[in-house]
Amino acid sequence: MSKKIVNPPRLQGLSRLRVRPKREKNTIPCGQEMAALLGCWQNHGGQTDTAQCANLVAALENCMKTTHRKTKSENTINYHLARLGKLL
């Protein structure tokens, strides 16, 4: 015997379809260089113009010049879900 489903279940309509963005790890560019420089300043009595930390200052400046910030690309999936939601 085969069973017939009289009333198939229906999904509830969603008012808005949205996807939550991924949480990205906050990576600090040049963070290691900055931490090393701050540690050097702390070890030398808080003086920021010491000759011992000059190489770390140069490394941090070089890192800041060469590092480019990534531009955040806009996610288009929410746009497509909004259009699809009108059809459902």
UniProtKB/Swiss-Prot annotation:
Extract the PROSITE patterns matched here: CHCH
InterPro entries tied to this protein: CHCH, Ribosomal_mS37_fun
Q: Which GO terms describe its cellular component?
A: mitochondrial small ribosomal subunit
Q: Which cysteines are joined by disulfide bonds?
A: 30-63, 40-53
Q: What is its main location?
A: mitochondrion
Which keywords describe this protein according to UniProt? Disulfide bond, Mitochondrion, Ribonucleoprotein, Ribosomal protein
Task: Identify a single GO molecular function assigned to this protein.
Answer: structural constituent of ribosome
Which sequence ranges form a coiled-coil region, renumbered to this chain? none
Motif stretch (Cx9C motif 2): 53-63
Q: Could you provide one GO biological process annotation from this protein's UniProt record?
A: mitochondrial translation
Q: How does it assemble?
A: Component of the mitochondrial small ribosomal subunit (mt-SSU). Mature yeast 74S mitochondrial ribosomes consist of a small (37S) and a large (54S) subunit. The 37S small subunit contains a 15S ribosomal RNA (15S mt-rRNA) and at least 32 different proteins. The 54S large subunit contains a 21S rRNA (21S mt-rRNA) and at least 45 different proteins.
What this protein is reported to do is described as: Component of the mitochondrial ribosome (mitoribosome), a dedicated translation machinery responsible for the synthesis of mitochondrial genome-encoded proteins, including at least some of the essential transmembrane subunits of the mitochondrial respiratory chain. The mitoribosomes are attached to the mitochondrial inner membrane and translation products are cotranslationally integrated into the membrane.
Family, as annotated: Belongs to the mitochondrion-specific ribosomal protein mS37 family.
The name this protein goes by in its record: Small ribosomal subunit protein mS37
Provenance organism = Schizosaccharomyces pombe (strain 972 / ATCC 24843)
